[in-house]
Swiss-Prot record:
It catalyses: H2O2 + AH2 = A + 2 H2O; 2 H2O2 = O2 + 2 H2O. Its cofactor is heme b. This is Catalase-peroxidase. Binds 1 heme b (iron(II)-protoporphyrin IX) group per dimer. Keywords: Heme, Hydrogen peroxide, Iron, Metal-binding, Oxidoreductase, Peroxidase.
Length: 723
């Protein structure tokens, strides 16, 4: 009886939390989520510490992989048959939806990590049945193993699909490294349900369609871009055009690229909605174990071929959906269209009158023809005046369309790979493209010590040198490998005028450093970083530590012509916890904004901690404020920030919005002021544990060494030329 009463209880004596149960973030949701700084480490990676994918992929037989992929396109499998005997449309959709999750605001998303294999992306409604595409690729992934990442394979499959249907692509680069668990740093929205409409209580809209919450680039939870049926599922091509324009712009695409990508994506393949959408099983993450990671099982019919239900819309856009041609524009512009509903009940458009020979054939029986269809987004290309202008030009000049689409598609699938120096493989194009943020090769043959000596004698202060170097490097984003010190774009528009860069101070410092660079043959980019290093060495020496900050010459200087000002505006800092600065008050807490920047810089929580403590005592605060400068020895690289932060002789009192006073408990005397960013290193239990390490009497030297190592990591974050 007792055994029966205990049946169903956790059989593991220690009660480890392997599934259900509240996490710390559930109990205390306002706590800092430091987990975003510690993802994708060796504990989750099955590859050995010595494994370097970017070296391994160069051993790949590139031609053999493409040959195998080309053969796969027409090797239809009974368990998931190819439409018209060709998997091209499916593979393109898979690659598109991987790359298309990128957003320019924070560089996150995109196809560069193989994240489509994991939640939530693998289970988004917009990615229905892409699980089948990846399973079709498994034999190729299995064959080439460690030399070919899922991330590269998913994107390459889309590229080869186009080529197999007659399109000449612009090129392809390998080098995307796989992750091994879902990303924790990417914000996909706050809605609690898939496809929640814009009047949802947790809506990503606060007003008109341009009020889409930053940094999001999709109109609904679970979509890549827009709702194909119309805004909130209500057909209206002109309103949908607004959504298309906003979402594609947030992926750094202009109107011409948007029309080209829409047309190129819909020239081939079809939508699937020939059935009852209510009879589709759960997505992969919700499916039972016997489904083996697959989802969306059709519970009402055989669910493949002509009976497939995916988006709910049904039909092909063109007459020949497995052939690259200019049929999309002829179909769209040469016909009048009327609203109808698919068998699954989705809104779509069909031609009012069409010749039978212009109708696409059935995916299984070529003797049967079906009506073509257009989504509301396709109709936006016809109805919106700006979009139609490009559509008509493309219709009249197919070669021009091919060129624009080839470049836009290449941009789409490489946007998150960073500069051209990261490209690998025989098909990587040589041309410099402005969206790659090109940087000329730098000089390594100058006398580094001579440059450092001139900087030391220049009269620049420690804070001026360190702050300028930091500002130059802090723009780096590990999400899409943009920004950083290489190129010295801090001296160019728009960065030279950013409030966070203190333009007046910056102009003064650059005036000195540019002269030194010209005299010595060093690049301005190298000279800026060297100045920061000189400042740190001086501050360390003043504190009794004789150190040399590591330095690798070779940074180049970009020109204004190499710089897309509009695109770089997205890199402007709105805050910088490292320099204790907020452009204005935001709904997001300052410490959360610091955490976001830290993650983009690729830093760990201990590295963030030691950098904050060092930057404070070096006097690098924006505008020279004294918040968080817990020392009487400003300009010396000491651990005073941590010593005084953890000293119980002091009490911390709020005196305003994001402002605190540090008072002597006995006398009541105010010793220092602080912000939330400062105090979080004493209040958060994890960060306090790091702060205590650096406050210890025996860790003064460790503090200096760790600060220098973290500093060097930031300065070299964009040095993809270094081993």
């Amino acid at each position: 009886m007792g055994d029966q009463q205990n049946a169903g209880k956790c059989p593991v004596m220690h009660g480890a939390m392997t599934s259900a149960g509240k996490s710390n973030m559930d109990w205390w949701p306002n706590n800092l989520n430091l987990d975003i700084l510690h993802q994708h480490d060796r504990k989750t990676n099955p590859m050995g510490e010595d494994f370097d994918y970017r070296e391994e992929v160069q051993k790949l037989d590139f031609d053999a992989v493409k040959k195998d992929l080309t053969e796969l396109m027409t090797n239809s499998q009974d368990w998931w048959p190819a439409d018209w005997g060709h998997y091209g449309g499916l593979m393109i959709r898979m690659a598109w939806h991987a790359a298309g999750s990128y957003r320019v605001a924070d560089g996150r998303g995109g196809g560069g990590t193989g994240n489509q294999r994991f939640a939530p992306i693998n289970s988004w409604p917009d990615n229905a049945n892409l699980d089948k595409a990846r399973r079709l690729l498994w034999p190729i992934k299995k064959k080439y193993g460690n030399k070919l990442s899922w991330a590269d394979l998913i994107i390459l499959a889309g590229n080869v699909a186009y080529e197999s249907m007659g399109f000449k692509t612009f090129g392809f680069s390998f080098g995307r490294e796989d992750i091994w668990h879902p990303e924790k740093d990417t914000y996909w929205g706050s809605e609690k349900e898939w496809l929640a409409p814009s009047d949802n209580p947790e809506s990503r809209y606060s007003g008109d369609r341009e009020s889409l919450e930053n940094p999001l680039a999709a109109v609904m939870m679970g979509l890549i871009y827009v709702n194909p049926e119309g805004v909130d599922g209500n057909p209206d091509p002109l309103k949908t055009a607004e959504d298309v324009r906003v979402t594609f712009a947030r992926m750094a695409m202009n109107d011409e690229e948007t029309v080209a990508l829409t047309a190129g994506g819909h020239t081939v393949g079809k939508c699937h909605g020939n059935g009852d959408a209510e009879k589709i099983g759960p997505e992969p993450e919700a499916a039972d174990v016997e489904e083996q990671g697959l989802g969306w099982r059709n519970l009402a019919s055989r669910g493949v071929g002509r009976d497939t239900v995916t988006s709910g819309l049904e039909g092909a856009w063109t007459t020949h959906p497995t052939r690259w041609d200019d049929g999309y524009f002829d179909m769209l512009l040469n016909h009048e269209w009327e609203l109808t509903k698919s068998p699954a009940g989705a809104w779509q458009w069909q031609p009012v009158d069409i010749k039978e020979e212009d109708m696409p054939v059935d995916v299984e029986d070529p003797s049967i023809r079906h009506m073509p269809m257009m989504t509301d987004a396709d109709m936006a290309m016809k109805m919106d005046p700006e979009y139609r202008k490009y559509a008509e030009r493309f219709q009249k000049d197919p070669e021009y369309f091919n060129e624009v689409f080839a470049r836009a598609w290449f941009k789409l699938i490489h946007r998150d790979m960073g500069p051209k120096t990261r490209y690998i493989g025989p098909e990587a194009p040589d041309e410099d493209l402005i969206w790659q943020d090109p940087v000329p090769a730098g000089n390594t043959g100058y006398d580094v010590d001579a440059v450092k000596a001139k900087i030391a004698d220049s009269g620049l202060s420690i804070s001026e040198m360190v702050a300028t170097a930091w500002d130059s490097a802090r723009t780096f984003r590990g999400s899409d490998y943009r920004g950083g010190a290489n190129g010295a774009r801090i001296r160019l528009a728009p960065q030279k005028d950013w409030e966070g860069n203190e333009p007046e101070r910056l102009s003064k410092v650059l005036g000195v450093l540019e002269g030194i660079a010209a005299d010595t043959g060093a690049s301005v980019a190298d000279t800026i970083v060297l100045a920061g290093n000189v400042g740190i060495e001086q501050a360390a020496k003043a504190a009794g530590h004789d150190i040399t900050v590591p330095f690798a010459p070779g940074r180049g200087d970009a020109s204004q012509e190499m710089t897309d000002e509009e695109s770089f505006e997205y890199l402007e800092p709105l805050s910088d916890g490292y320099r204790n600065w907020l452009k204005k008050d935001y709904a997001v807490a300052p410490e959360e904004m610091m955490l976001d920047r830290t993650q983009l810089l690729g830093l760990t929580a201990p590295e963030m901690t030691v950098l904050i403590g060092g930057m404070r005592v070096l006097g690098t605060n924006h505008g020279g404020t004294q918040h968080g400068v817990f020392t009487d020895r400003e300009g010396q690289l000491t651990n005073d920030f941590f010593v005084n932060l953890t000293d119980m002789n002091y009490a911390w009192e709020p005196v305003g919005n994001n402002l605190y006073e540090i008072r002597d408990r006995k006398t009541g005397e105010t010793r220092w002021t602080a912000t939330r960013v400062d105090l979080v290193f004493g209040s958060n239990s994890i960060l306090r544990s790091y702060a205590e390490v650096y406050a210890q009497d025996d860790n003064k030297e460790k503090f200096v060494k760790d600060f220098v190592a973290a500093w060097n990591k930031v300065m070299n974050a964009d040095r993809f030329d270094l081993a």
